[in-house]
Amino acid sequence: MEPIEQQLTELRTTLRHHEYLYHVMDAPEIPDAEYDRLMRELRELEAQRPDLITPDSPTQRVGAAPLTAFNQIRHEVPMLSLDNVFDEESFLAFNKRVQDRLKSTENVIWCCELKLDGLAVSILYENGVLVSAATRGDGTTGEDITSNVRTIRAIPLKLHGDNIPARLEVRGEVFLPQAGFEKINEDARRTGGKVFANPRNAAAGSLRQLDPRITAKRPLTFFCYGVGILEGGELPDTHLGRLLQFKAWGLPVSDRVTLCDSPQAVLDFYRNVEKDRPTLGFDIDGVVIKVNSLVLQEQLGFVARAPRWAVAFKFPAQEQMTFVRDVEFQVGRTGAITPVARLEPVQVAGVLVSNATLHNADEIERLGLRIGDKVVIRRAGDVIPQVVNVVLSERPEETRPIVFPTHCPVCGSDVERVEGEAVTRCTGGLICGAQRKESLKHFVSRRAMDVDGMGDKIIDQLVEREYVHTPADLFRLTAGKLTGLDRMGPKSAQNVVNALEKAKATTFARFLYALGIREVGEATAAGLAAYFGTLEALQTATIDELQKVPDVGIVVATHVFNFFAEESNRDVIGQLLAEGVHWPAPVVINVQEIDSPFAGKTVVLTGSLSQMSRDDAKARLAALGAKVAGSVSKKTDLVIAGEAAGSKLAKAQELGITVIDEAEMIRLLGA
C-alpha cells in the first residue's frame, strides 16, 4: 500500500468515527473546526489522487447512519450539506467559480441568511397537513421524529393560506434559544440530571427522545430555509420568494435574510451578523450564501455531496482543542472554592485562552477530567471559557487525577460542602486572606459603597500588610498609612481618604448589598430595604417574615437570617455605623395613592435596555410604586424584556407571567 493510500484510509476512518459520534450518538468529541480541517485534508489528498477516491469516502456522502431505535424515513430528495469557506479570500474564489460557470460578467444576486447551529430536519405536508418529519441522517435515510416535531409550537400542524401544494417537504433547522438552554441546564443541575455542553447538543438530545412528552417540555423552535419534495403546486422562482411564501403559509422564517448584489455586500452582511452574534439569543456558526435565482441554481447543479450554488461562510471557531496542564483552586468572597484549569494557550474566537473554569467537583466528575487530558474549550461572547468535554480517544498515558482540596489552599482552614449544594467552601471566614480580599473588593465596588479610586491592587496590599481586617477598618485609614503602599503618593492617598469619607453617605439598599450576604444581589437588597425600612427591623426579622419580601425564598431568607444572627457580623455593622456610615430615613410610599400601572407590582427586568440605563429604569419603576426584583418567581407580576433576554424570560413564559418590551415600559412610564 502506498503511503498516500494509507493516509487516505486513516483519514476516512477518523472522519467516519467522528461522524458517528456527531450524527448518531449526539456526543461529538472534537469541535466542528477540527472536523472541517480533517475533511479539507482528505479533499486535498483525493484531489491529488482521484483514482483512489472510494464510493464510501466521507467526501462522497453527507453523514452517518441513523439509529435503529427510531423508524427510518427515506428522503425522496437527498438532504445534502453545504461546502464551507472560512475567510474572505475563499468566499471571493467561490464567487468567481459561480460567475465563471454561469459565463456571466454581471454580479450574481445572493440571498444571505444565518447558519443556525441546531439539527437539520425535513417536514412533509400533504394538502397542508403535517404528516411526517425526519432528521437528515446520512442524507438519504433519516429518523422518523414526527411525534417529537409535532410538540414544537413554532411548527404549524396545518398550513394556512392559498395555493398550498398537494405535497410539500419543508427543510429547516430545529434549535434551542440560549434562554431555553440555560433553563434546561439549571433544572438539570438542581435535579441531578444530564447537563448539556451547548445548545446544539441540547436541541439534538431533546428532539431525539423516544418519549415525545420529554421533547414537549423543551423550548425548541424552528426556522425553515429550503424545500425538498414539491408536487401539485408551484413556488416562486427565487429563494427569497420561497421563504416569503413559507412565511405566508405560517412557517417560521428567520428575519435576518438579505439580498446582496455584490461580493462586497455579502462580506458586509457577514461582518454585521458576526458583530450582532452575541445578542441574537441563539447560536449560529456562520452565514449561508445562496444564489437567489432558482433558474441559475439549476444551471449550476451539484457536486457529489453539496450544491454548487450555495456555501456556508463560517465564523472563527468558538471551540478549539488544547491540553490541561494543571488545575488550581481559587477562593471567592463567600469562601467558594472554584477549580480553574490552566491550559496550553490556544486561540478561541479570536482570543488567546489559557484558563477555563471547571465550576466545582461535580463538574470535574461529570467530565471525567484528568490533568494532562486533551479537551475541547468553548468561548462564546463574553462567557468565561469552559471545558466542554474530554477527548477520551486521545488521552495521554501520563494523565493524573484531580484531587479536590480538603483544606483551604489559602488559609489552611477546613473545607465543607453543605448537603444539596454543588459548591465546596472554606470555613475560615475573614481569617482567610482570599475571602477578606474579595469581600473588601465587593464592599468598595461601584454598585456597593462606591469608593472611588480604591482598586483591587490597593485592597490586595492592605490585606497582605494586615492594615485592614474588616470593612470598618477601611474608614480608619489615614493618608500617611496609604502613602506607604506601592505607587501611592501623598496626593493619591488623600484622594482615597476623601473618597472613603464621601462613601459614608449611602443608601440602605447599597449598604445591605455591600455587606456581601450570600445570594443577596442588588435587587434583593433593594427589596429588603424597601420592605423593612430600617436596619433594626431587618436584623430582628424571622425567616417567615423575610420570605414575604419579593424575590426572597427560603434559601435567601435563611442566608439573611443566619448573617444577622452571627455576632461577628453584627459587630462589624456596629463599627461601620460608629465610623459614620449613614443613609437617609426611609420614605414610605403609599402605593394606593399612586396612579400608575406599576404601583404595587413586583417587576423583573431582563436583557439590555437601549433607551435608558438599568439603574434609571429601576429608579423610575420604584418611584411609581413598583417592587423591582432580581429573579422571576410565582410572586412576579410583570417581566420587562430587553434585547437578548435570557433565562428569566423563559421562566416568565413558563409561569404565564405578563411580559412587555422596553417600548411598552417607556409608554407606561409616561402614562
From Swiss-Prot:
Among Pfam families, the record links this protein to: BRCT (PF00533), DNA_ligase_aden (PF01653), DNA_ligase_OB (PF03120), DNA_ligase_ZBD (PF03119), HHH_2 (PF12826), HHH_5 (PF14520), Nlig-Ia (PF22745)
Catalyzed reaction equations? NAD(+) + (deoxyribonucleotide)n-3'-hydroxyl + 5'-phospho-(deoxyribonucleotide)m = (deoxyribonucleotide)n+m + AMP + beta-nicotinamide D-nucleotide
Gene Ontology terms: biological process: DNA repair; DNA replication
**What keywords are assigned to this protein?**
DNA damage, DNA repair, DNA replication, Ligase, Magnesium, Manganese, Metal-binding, NAD, Zinc
- Name the coenzymes or cofactors required: Mg(2+); Mn(2+)
Annotated EC: 6.5.1.2
Question: Does Ribosomal protein count among this protein's keywords?
Answer: no
GO: which molecular function terms? DNA binding; DNA ligase (NAD+) activity; metal ion binding
Against PROSITE patterns, the record matches this protein to: BRCT, DNA_LIGASE_N1, DNA_LIGASE_N2
- Residues at the active site: K115
EC top class, as a word:
ligase
The record places domain BRCT at 593-671
Positions that bind NAD(+): D32, A33, E34, Y35, D36, S81, L82, E113, R136, E173, K290, K314
What are the annotated GO cellular component locations? cytosol
Q: Which SMART domains match?
A: BRCT (SM00292), HhH1 (SM00278), LIGANc (SM00532)
Write out the residues that bind Zn(2+). Answer: C408, C411, C426, C432
Family, according to the entry, reads as follows: Belongs to the NAD-dependent DNA ligase family. LigA subfamily.
Question: What's this protein's function?
Answer: DNA ligase that catalyzes the formation of phosphodiester linkages between 5'-phosphoryl and 3'-hydroxyl groups in double-stranded DNA using NAD as a coenzyme and as the energy source for the reaction. It is essential for DNA replication and repair of damaged DNA.
Please give the name of this protein.
DNA ligase
Q: List the source organism.
A: Salmonella dublin (strain CT_02021853)
